[in-house]
């Protein structure tokens, strides 16, 4: 769905790359994280630009995972490849899925669920920025998870914050991305410009 918002970011002078990935159950959750890591490596090799990773729902999980990735273990990219991420209605602790029908797709157990949950990973470095946006009308679990990961990461020195968007739910929050004048688009565009400027200064 995020590809429909590309023009709003282009209006702010921000280039957009929309990355697809293989879905569960064809592959596992961490296989998808690996796909996205390879995609960002390819983008770096092509553009030499630092991306701001934006994702919704499962994509929010991936945004957090890519920010928290230890890029020093990936050959051919800078160790600070991802300096900022903006997760919208993200899932940062996948353990609650174990008791739902969704686990028929993701096929996790207690150990693999914890290993796939960014909230339990070592936090990103202190100079990284992470925003978790969540709808005010979403379930308490989505709100709890956004508050939890930003609390854990900010406690570790990461510039992390939770933004609750009043009057929106898990789906209508995406309307913010369709408005070039929204606070969400402006924030993401600002992060993109800051990352680009910091890369030029290195």
Residue ranges and their predicted role:
Residues 133, 144-147, 154-202:
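C-terminal catalytic histidine-bearing segment of alpha/beta-hydrolase fold enzymes
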Residues 21-25, 92, 169:
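Alpha/beta-hydrolase active-site loop signature
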Residues 38-101:
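Primarily recognizes the serine-hydrolase "nucleophile elbow" in alpha/beta-hydrolase
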Residues 78-79, 84-95, 110-147:
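The feature captures the conserved acid-bearing segment of alpha/beta-hydrolase catalytic domains
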Residues 6-26:
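Conserved alpha/beta-hydrolase
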Residues 17-19, 88, 163:
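The conserved SAM/SAH-binding core of class I Rossmann-like methyltransferase domains
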